[in-house]
Amino acid sequence: MTSHIECQNFFRSLQLLDLFTKIGVKNLILCPGSRSGPLAIAAGELNKRRVLNVFNSIDERSAGFHSLGISTASGDVSLVVTTSGTAVGNLLPAAIEADKSCKSIVFITADRPLRLKNCGSNQTVNQEEFLNSVCRSNLSTNLNGIHENNDDDILKIVETVKKQILQSPGPIHLNIAFEKPLDISLKNKKKNFEVFERFYLNKTYKFLKNDNQNKNIQFSEKFFKRINLSNPGIIIVGPYQGSTKDLFSFNSALKKLQEITGWPVFVDPVSGVSAELKGLVENWELILKKNKNIIQCDQILRFGPLSSSNYLEDFLLNFEGLQILVKENNIRKLDPIKKSLEYDFGISNFVNQLLGAFLNHKKKSKPLINLGQVLIKEGAKIKEILKEQLFSNTEITEYKLANFVPKIWPENYPIMLSASSPIRDWLTFSENATLTRECFSFRGASGIDGTLSLALGIARITKPLLLVTGDLALIHDINGFLIENAIELNLTILLINNNGGNIFNNLYKNNLDEEELKKLFIMPKSINWENLAKGYQVPIKNVSDLNKLREAFEWSLSMQKSVIIKVDINVENEMKGRNLILKKILTS
């Protein structure tokens, strides 16, 4: 009986992981543990044969975010395997972000069999419920143990996962009960793998395919007739939520839409929009701040979630015309201001249906409308002011970095922006300079959680990568450096060291004294970054002159591994300089 259970634990684990590779899984992040032993051993066998990439992480929280980074950059489903107990609870932060950003991860968690539940057994908790609120599906094998499952059971689980990620990409929780023994003898492992290799490894299966472009969408033509292509409007593109594999079709549809409308386009730094799109307006957030009344139109087409801009939110809230919000991979409500008609089926389907409603516009391309010309000229005026003001000296500030860095980091190399200050500064000051490349930022739940682990996951797929992050965001996830071969990944970390949460200076400084502000919000930490980097064997370079930053990037790229470039920020000078520039723009 014991031999049967150990063989079945291993064999069913092999089947399961192999079937996941057949629906496109290439990467698995493995966390340590005993109860998950059969999964670990099975993953090891598949890894030896190059069927599955396996990377280990001792921190489940970090592993979850690392897997999310991989999934985001690759467009493929990724796996995380953990043991039982609190290990499962540590997956929740990454599951929340995967849920809100619509990225597919399967969290596979090992558990005790049913006989050990609710009786005080060690390391036995109600882990099957931990991720319920954020996962698209919560699945399980036989509650007595996976050894009691058959071929059809395992296949059905993977078919369910495939169907779910096609319908609504996001996290999935698969809880697997394992009865002891968890280990397997060398003899039994060899014997079982030979059977698996002969009958299962090269077996083909028919899984559902993505036919998103051919959905039979029943959407009223009256909806599209509300759009008047003869009148002015604006296209606003927020953070991209689709798959990286769909970016080409996304941009093709957007290009077609802009051509038939002639409308100007506002884009987020992480919109995924190509720099070659016509009608792009630079410095649009500063235009809204300076004079939103310059925008005279009665219709707006929005794509994706709302950008992190109070000025944009205020503009849309007070806009009296038609707003249509088109979503990618997201069937939930996505408009916090609640003033738009929401379309769930993506931009490609939207443009096709729009053209169907306006057949006479199909082949007509319009020049940029007058509103677009006005906005682009206004953006150019602000650009000249920024050019004059930003580089009057070489002191490094956060807003200067937002403008300068995307222009000197090689234009085809990707960038990731951490949450909090960087994404907001780049929205305001980057002048669309991110659009020549892939630019990532995790705007689902918008937390600083998992910043380093996410970046390392992206760098595993697309490199070299630049991560722009504040000091608190980096230290919060410093365990990311403990992920297998993390130090060898080609990641440049631009560390903006302002000794705490500088964003809170802008929010609470006026009503709190300095010590209260530090204790309650900024929370400064006197970290010796040089010693910390040395402890993880990560090279670090300090830069204090803006003109030396290009040279520092050349150094980091030559290292071809994880490195830190640290820039120290004088918070008082930062705030004064920022306010002076904004005043100059507003009074111009």
Swiss-Prot record:
It catalyses: isochorismate + 2-oxoglutarate + H(+) = 5-enolpyruvoyl-6-hydroxy-2-succinyl-cyclohex-3-ene-1-carboxylate + CO2. Pathway: Quinol/quinone metabolism; 1,4-dihydroxy-2-naphthoate biosynthesis; 1,4-dihydroxy-2-naphthoate from chorismate: step 2/7; Cofactor biosynthesis; phylloquinone biosynthesis. It is an enzyme of class 2 (transferase). Its EC number is 2.2.1.9. InterPro entries: MenaQ_synth_MenD, THDP-binding, Thiamin_PyroP_enz_TPP-bd_dom, TPP_enzyme_TPP-bd. One of its GO terms (biological process) is menaquinone biosynthetic process. Pfam families: TPP_enzyme_C, TPP_enzyme_N. The keyword Transferase applies. GO terms for molecular function: 2-succinyl-5-enolpyruvyl-6-hydroxy-3-cyclohexene-1-carboxylic-acid synthase activity; magnesium ion binding; manganese ion binding; thiamine pyrophosphate binding. Binds 1 thiamine pyrophosphate per subunit. Homodimer. Belongs to the TPP enzyme family. MenD subfamily. This is 2-succinyl-5-enolpyruvyl-6-hydroxy-3-cyclohexene-1-carboxylate synthase. The gene is menD.
